[in-house]
Curated annotation (Swiss-Prot):
Coiled coil: none
Source organism (scientific name): Xenopus tropicalis (Western clawed frog)
Residue range(s) of DNA binding per entry: 149-243
Protein's name according to its UniProt entry: Forkhead box protein A2
InterPro entries: Fork-head_N, Fork_head_dom, Forkhead_box_C, FOX_domain-containing, TF_fork_head_CS_1, TF_fork_head_CS_2, WH-like_DNA-bd_sf, WH_DNA-bd_sf
DNA-binding among keywords: yes
Biological process terms in GO annotation: mesoderm formation; positive regulation of DNA-templated transcription
Biased composition (Low complexity): 263-291, 317-333
Bias (Basic and acidic residues): 249-262
TM region positions: none
Amino acid sequence: MLGAVKMEGHEATDWSSYYGEPEAYSSVGNMNAGLSMNPMNTYMSMSAMSTSANMTAGSMNMSYVNTGMSPSLTGMSPGTGAMTGMGTGVASMASHLSPSMSPMSAQATSMNALAPYTNMNSMSPIYGQSNINRSRDPKTYRRSYTHAKPPYSYISLITMAIQQSPNKMLTLSEIYQWIMDLFPFYRQNQQRWQNSIRHSLSFNDCFLKVPRSPDKPGKGSFWTLHPDSGNMFENGCYLRRQKRFKCEKKPSLREGGGKKLSEGSSSVGSAANSSSESSVGNESPHSSSSPCQEQKRSLVDMKSSQGLSPDHAASPASQAQHLLSQHHSVLSHEAQSHLKPEHHYSFNHPFSINNLMSSEQQHHHHHHHNHHHHHKMDLKAYEQVMHYSGYGSPMTGSLAMSTVTNKSGLESSPISSDTSYYQGVYSRPIMNSS
């Protein structure tokens, strides 16, 4: 350290001209008292404030003290403390090398050499804060928070779109449009994610391609959920699949395949049964290209396998309704072997599709679900017990107490209409796309 000071000693004029303006400090002792309180500082300040005759020795002592003390300084970093000592040593060596320089100028030089580093250290928190609080360029943000990527997989998005549709089937362009309407993130880079949607539809067994019927002209085939796929997502939460659906064999029109296709339509959603029932009842038995043609053929196969009377087979509409009511009763036992058939919670989860849609859509979507009414009652009671009634729920305190204590009182309460129920849960959608 001292060798470096001796080597740079002849540049004392450069140092004094570089830090030209003297900083005004009351004494070196006050400045060091703020840094730490050890007895070395007392000696350092006394030696710096000694008479002009002893100034060179004092400043030399100052350089030694600063060099040895630099790791223990509290206000300054060790490297800066060493630099301060070097600057002081340069100033004191200048008083040795140039006899024409008075000891007072050496003191001023040592003060000037010491002052800028100390000044820089005292200003460094302000510099740091200004760097932290500096306003960022808005271009550095990729997008705002409302346009962040949704936490759903592509299979979840497709399943949501298909399940909310009235006929439980959508074309590819309708799936695209539904996703873009609900999630603003997917309004950009459409080519990338739409390619992934097509791959997900093609390579997953839970999605079936349904040919377009002549009574529905247009472009593109329909996509629907496999009737056996069941409740793929945990309690209607689309964030995680509980089981990957795999077809054991390709569904055929034989008896086994027909039974496989006919079962499980209510595990996708209860409205699928009512819509398929009405479509089977309305269409003629010879229109083989109806949207539910696989299910109709499977029902005919089931009819032939059960050996019903020929006069019963003359009315295929009543036949289909009868078979549908039959396989409704069998469905609960068969579905337990595949996936958990917990439909009670399927459509009223914080991340479910009903809470993403507005209340009008929910009312329209669940218009056919009057037979699921008691399940919605259970959900409302659970919501009141768990103290979630603050989300815009118009229920009074007495009604909330009756949900906890008296279940029959709840079922006769005025909350039993669909519109009041859904407007009570959420008056507006959680993720609106505006």
